Amino acid sequence: MSGAFGAMNPAAAPLVWEVGALCRAVSDALQARFNPVAVRGEISGFSRAASGHCYFSIKDAGGQIRCAMFRRAAQLMDFSPRDGELVELRGRLGVYEQRGDLQLVVESMQRAGQGALFEQFLRLKARLEAEGLFDAARKRSLPPLPRGIGVVTSPGAAALHDVITALRRRVPHIPVVLVPALVQGVQAPASLIDALQRLYGLAREGAGSVDGSVAGAPPIDTILLVRGGGSIEDLWAFNDERLARTIVQSPVPLISGVGHETDFTIADFCADLRAPTPTAAAELVSQPREVWMGALQLMQGRLEDGVQRLLDRQQQRLDLAAQRLGRPSEQLARSRLQLSRQAQRLRHAMQLRLQRMDHAGQGLQAQLPAGMRRGLDRRADHLARMELRLQLLDPRLVLQRGYALLTDAEGHPVTEARSAPPGTALQAQLADGSLDLVVTQPRLL
């Protein structure tokens, strides 16, 4: 037995690691080698915890990495991430020791390629705004009852189906003219401009005719420029400067309905009205048929009542004129007497009214200061009580006395020492900030 042990070479034995220590060593090595790190890929399994922290994976065809984005970094995002979206991340690479997983702690996130495109978008927006293309004074109101609606979009897009469905449901009697155009790609701006110019021609020709129509085409007095949602690259055609200048030349009100509610393009700022979606654009220009029928019936009733009242007044005047022609001298004497009595009553009423107003003003002048003081005193007392209650309920007072609020990596409060084994990552919220902690040895009471 002793010989067997003697055959072993202690010097050649490998270092035996504790699991947590090995995880920390690997994490330190990764941070020293790769941090800071930037990575591009698709979002997968995105979720936002009640604490505000975000957890997801970033992946491509070659692999995936688990990611954690804490609340402070998540609050700086200007968009809502979705699964399958291509993004660029920047952060610190390490190991989540509790699971031994490779993890990227994300410090910033943006859509892939968005940085340069967004800067280009902001520069163009600022220049066109300085030229006055976005001024509210040039925005026009929509016609209350359009005679014809022009639509510019892709003929195979879901946006067209949404628009046509909404218009047929709400205003099936209004004709719609579709001018197809490309809505994505390098050729899309020129295609959109050509489609708009064709509708502008129809609108101008219709404005010069008696009924607003052109031979073979209905009148056009409203235009919808629509497209479904997509990435900033997908919607980039609607940020074209030539398209923006074409939009502001529209002879009739133009509504843009590009993307989703959170998407904004240069076309939105140039249009007379911006709708959050293509369906909303159609609804803005189309009051339901029931609303217009009700309005027409109401106007018809008012017109009939007005005509009847006019006829009644004229008949009454005719009757009175006939009576006066019978005895004009007696009627004149009665009118003079009646006028004299009315003038006397009016003078007397005015004197009484002025006297009452004078007495009332004197009374109010005496009562107003005292009433105001009492009201101000009551409000000041109520405000002081509310301020004291707020101060007593302020959790920061507890933190300022040296206490701290501990949360785990998931943002859940830690209230028991046994729930935080060695190596657990915690965050301590203090009165003036927070600390990231790692448990070395819990001590139970």
UniProtKB/Swiss-Prot annotation:
CDD domains: ExoVII_LU_OBF. Keywords: Cytoplasm, Exonuclease, Hydrolase, Nuclease. GO terms for biological process: DNA catabolic process. Signal peptide: none annotated. It catalyses: Exonucleolytic cleavage in either 5'- to 3'- or 3'- to 5'-direction to yield nucleoside 5'-phosphates. One of its GO terms (molecular function) is nucleic acid binding. It comes from the Bacteria. It is found in: Cytoplasm. GO terms for cellular component: cytoplasm; exodeoxyribonuclease VII complex. InterPro entries: Exonuc_VII_L, Exonuc_VII_lsu_C, OB-fold_nuc-bd_dom. Its main location: cytoplasm. It holds the Pfam family tRNA_anti_2. Its EC number is 3.1.11.6. The keyword DNA-binding does not apply. PANTHER family: EXODEOXYRIBONUCLEASE 7 LARGE SUBUNIT (PTHR30008:SF0). HAMAP family: Exonuc_7_L. Belongs to the XseA family. Bidirectionally degrades single-stranded DNA into large acid-insoluble oligonucleotides, which are then degraded further into small acid-soluble oligonucleotides. Heterooligomer composed of large and small subunits. This is Exodeoxyribonuclease 7 large subunit. The gene is xseA.
